[in-house]
Amino acid sequence: MNILDPFTGTGTFIVNLLQDEELMPADKLSLKYRDEIWCNEILLLAYYIATINIEYAYHSRVPEKYVPFVGAVLTDTFQMYEEGDSLDLEMFTDNTERILEEMEASIHVIVGNPPYSIGQKDANDNNKNVDYKTLDSRIGDTYAKGSAAGLKKGLYDQYIRAFRWATDRIAERGIVSFVTNGGWLDAQAMDGFRKCLVEEFNSIYVFNLRGNQRTQGEQSRKEGGKIFGSGSRAPIAITMLVKNPASEEHGAIHYHDIGDYLDREMKLAKILLCRMWVAHPPPRALP
């Protein structure tokens, strides 16, 4: 089962995966590390840091012999899949082979924290607004086509592009799990996006962490703390989308709101508690 973080940054998701002995048992670790984990990053410094962090995480559990991590790819994830485009092959010659191997691999799990773009404040932001004709055409044929909103610019935000790209990349079976701006949950312009999620996935899990600081007064206090601290005013949501042809669910929505008036530390504690419950569910009550 191949795993991909298409926007890895400094490798946090992959590092935590490798360090977690429940998610990554010892008998699976070497195979995953060598052959079944991929991550993409467009910034050179972050790419090198991610590689170092991932190698350190692996060797903290398997210290006997140094094994380089070959799943890191220096690339623009969206651009490398554009039809008729050879940008990556020309710009990133040192890892051309890895780009081609990743493109040929069947990807079953995609996880990450996609960048945002709509409303960015600086032209030097990591998430520059770039046109991706093939990807944007897919959005036009799906999310935009199904929308009744007059203004559809938000459907081309980088994180919405990430959902469209990942949905197509896993094909007929797999999991997409992203930590993103939570604005898509109730924004009018996102109606077509929400509709497509129900149509394209068997199961939809959403953990709404709230934190929308673009609100005012009592509503702002109810939204609570910002998960990413002072660096973001947007609400945050954790979303997991499951495609499984054998599932009895079809467009089933499993939604949880973290609650009102919680500061950042309280939210993080609640997230940890939920993770512990998933890993070690309490016994069912006797009848």
Stretches found by the model and what they are:
Residues M1-Y205:
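SAM-dependent methyltransferase catalytic region
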